[in-house]
Swiss-Prot record:
Name used for this protein in its record: Penicillin-binding protein activator LpoB
GO molecular function: enzyme activator activity; enzyme binding; enzyme regulator activity
Covalent lipid sites (S-diacylglycerol cysteine): C20
Gene it is expressed from: lpoB
Lineage, opening ranks: Bacteria, Pseudomonadati, Pseudomonadota, Gammaproteobacteria, Enterobacterales
Organism expressing this protein natively: Escherichia coli (strain K12)
Free-text function comment from the UniProt entry: Regulator of peptidoglycan synthesis that is essential for the function of penicillin-binding protein 1B (PBP1b). Stimulates transpeptidase and transglycosylase activities of PBP1b in vitro. May also contribute to outer membrane constriction during cell division, in complex with PBP1b.
GO cellular component, one term: cell outer membrane
Amino acid sequence: MTKMSRYALITALAMFLAGCVGQREPAPVEEVKPAPEQPAEPQQPVPTVPSVPTIPQQPGPIEHEDQTAPPAPHIRHYDWNGAMQPMVSKMLGADGVTAGSVLLVDSVNNRTNGSLNAAEATETLRNALANNGKFTLVSAQQLSMAKQQLGLSPQDSLGTRSKAIGIARNVGAHYVLYSSASGNVNAPTLQMQLMLVQTGEIIWSGKGAVSQQ
């Protein structure tokens, strides 16, 4: 009887405790309130740097072609040989010319109203007198050295008959051939004079027309 009473007491106690647990109210849940929003700080305006105005590029000076430039000189070609050969033949057969004498051929002097290649004319004249059988020509090197002594370039003409005779004496020549082109440059006239160096006497002269090629 005693054991049964204990068992019943324990059972009743257990049921009582279970009922108490079931009737316990749940713990209150605290409501989480959102934190108050902080007012945003006003943003400071970013200072703007004023843009530098673009300076328009200044136009450069207007270049004009030089309208005053002289035109290129017209190059003329002459038939020097055609004009010189007949005169050289007459000179070699002239009276008073001693065979074997030394002849100085001066550069052709341009006395026309324009520009012409006097060096070409001089070279043609020397070629026409080469191997002539009567004169020994003063070499171009000897003539060049004699001109340099007078302060002239090898291409310069002596200009006057007196200078030509003076040069001829310095190089030991007996005769000097003085030549000049004169008149209109488009149709010049070639004049040749053979002079005796010792006296300056003109022992032969001739002239002829020079045509362009």
